[in-house]
Every structure is written in structure tokens, then in C-alpha cells.
Amino acid sequence: MSIKHHPLQGALWMLTAGLAFAIVNSVAQYASIQFGLPSTTVALVQYAIAIVVILPYLKTLGIRQSLRTQQFGWHLLRVFLAVIGIQLWLWALAYPVPIWQGIALLMTSPLFATIGSGLWLREKVGMARWVATLTGFIGAMIILEPWADDFNLASLLPVGAAFFWASYSLMVKKLSSHDSPSTMVVYLLLLITPFNLLLALPDWQMPNGQTVWLLLIGAGVMTALAQWAIAKAYAVADASFVQPFDHAKLPLNVLAGWLVFGWVPPGRLWLGAAIIVLSVAFITQWETKKSRRERNIA
């Protein structure tokens, strides 16, 4: 266990991140639906503002030193994958895919990461984790109901976002043996806006009016707060303790969707989400035990 393990602080920071993300999602969705803003415009403005807010933290990392890397091409690919995930997610919200459905499907990201770790990183996954992964996707199918008459392909956008964010996390894992965490953060924050700009230009629409700008600024500030809160959570408490609190984002986003749009999720959401959460919890616990065994051997 970490010397600086403060469970209550870690839990509160993770819950703060979940609440901030719920606000971000509902605000971004409201801006797209009510003001007709393209999701690419929302992504560009939201993350550009977040970077301005988080700039003081960026300076503490030592930008010049953090920029030193021999893996620049891989960092470009890593950030590109993250941006595609962001774009698909905001596209889903703009469509609109209800927040309750989107956030539950987004929770399949660790399942994709498990598949990628076996196929790409050549890690030994084992039968138990393969079964847990398959079970998790069954939960996603229950939420999606692809056999229903009213099924829409747009419902798959959050699944696409989950896939690209899982790919991003695998890139982080691969690069962690070459570069420091500060290098990862600096390149992410510096490259995310140029990528978002390239994707926003073809469909660019200038946000018009005080209300929409207040919404976008609020979303940017909350995005920065969420990222900072996650970093604080993992800094003050053990990862194995903090990780389960990430699942609080589901009820928080469901609550936000109900308050802002009046969306009430059907019963199948809770069944499917419970299956996904249990599958991810099993995989996370397995990974934690594996890491401890490796540290003990070392």
C-alpha cells in the first residue's frame, strides 16, 4: 500500500471528477441541441478553454524537459486516438444519444483495453478475463438492444468512443516504459487543440450569444477540474482503492440527464450497466493482483 494512502480524500476527488464530467456532458449536449452547434465546434472550444485553465499546472511539469522524447510519432498517434474518442463522444451527445445510454456504453472501454492488451501488447490475458470481457459486452448488448425495431446506428457512437479511448490507454501503457507521466500529459495538452482545430474547420460555426459562450466556458472549466481531480485522486490514494469510485459517473450522469432533459432510463440500463461494472471490477481486481505479484517477484 502507498505511504500516502488517504482513502477519504481519494474517494472525494474521484467523486468530484465524476460530478464534473456529468456537468460537462449535460452542458455539451445542451449546447449542441439547443444552439445547433456542431460537436466539432463544441470539442474545440471546450478543450481549448480547459487548456487555458490548466496552464498553471502545465508549467509545474517543466514543459521543456517534458518535451524531450524519442517517441514523438507515437505521441502523435496517441493523442490522435484520444481526439477521435472525444469527437465520437460529443457527436453522440449532439445526435442526441441519451446521456444514460452513452455513459453506460462508454464504460466498456476497459473491455476493449483487455482485448487490445492480449492482441497488441501480447500480454497473457487468460480464460477468466476473456470470459469477463465477453460478459461485459453482453451487458452492453442489453443496453443497446440492437434487435429492437427502433435501434439506431448512432447508438454505437459511444462504443466507438470507448474503443478509441481504450486504444489511447494502451498507447499510454506502451509509452510508459520510455517516457515520464509528465511527458504524457504535456504532449496530450499541447496536441489536442491542433487536432480538434483540424476536425472543426470544415464544419466551423462561431458560437453566437452570451448564453452559449457561458455554457462552453463552463464546460471547459469543468473539464479541467475533472482532469485535475482524477490526478489528485490517484496521487493521494492507491489506484486499486480509487478505481471503483469511477463507476459513480453512471448515476451522476443519469441524474444530470434527468435534471436537464427529463430523461428517465429504462430498467434494462441498470441490468446491463451492472453486468458491465461487475466485469470491469473483476478485470481491474485481476490486474491489481497481477501487479502486486510482479512487484513481489522484483
Curated annotation (Swiss-Prot):
Claim: 4Fe-4S is one of the keywords in the record: no
Cellular location(s): Cell membrane
Parts of the chain that traverse the membrane: 8-28, 35-55, 79-99, 101-121, 125-145, 151-171, 184-204, 211-231, 258-278
Domain EamA: 10-144, 156-284
Keyword Ligase among UniProt keywords: no
Assigned GO CC terms: membrane; plasma membrane
Superkingdom as given in the UniProt entry: Bacteria
Primary site of residence: membrane
Pfam families membership: EamA
Keywords annotated in UniProt: Cell membrane, Membrane, Repeat, Transmembrane, Transmembrane helix, Transport
Membrane-topology descriptor: Multi-pass membrane protein
Family: Belongs to the drug/metabolite transporter (DMT) superfamily. 10 TMS drug/metabolite exporter (DME) (TC 2.A.7.3) family.
Function comment: Transports riboflavin into the cell.
Name listed for the protein in its UniProt record: Riboflavin transporter
Organism encoding this protein: Vibrio cholerae serotype O1 (strain ATCC 39315 / El Tor Inaba N16961)
